[in-house]
Amino acid sequence: MAKTATEKLRQNKATKKVVLDKDFAGIKAGQRMLVGTPQMMDAYIRKIPFGETRTMQRLRNELARRNKCDATCPVSTAIFVRISAEAAIEAMELGADIADVTPFWRIVGPDDKIAAKLNIDSEWIRQQRALEI
């Protein structure tokens, strides 16, 4: 049986720092790339203050800088942000209060590609953002 997003989020994974031997996703060969974890993305999102939003680009830049890297892997970042968002949605479906889940709508915009993949209407994301203005 496939793991739930909550199970994926709880898996202990180590961050990796990789020096690229060839260009990858806009990151140049020779640059140091951070490959984060679902927990790292979740922790970052939880720290975004009420009423504020962030872009994926800002998330990647800040995490790279904090970890002394040139860039953060955009592919794994998108996957791990999605895991964090899906775990929050699962928790709400099980009755968790919105105040107790990771506020993924602060990083995932209603028109983002990730939003289209989530099991929640993008209008809901739009409404959550509007409630925090």
Region roles according to the model:
Residues A2-A5, K13-I133:
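Nucleic acid-binding interface residues in structured DNA/RNA-binding domains
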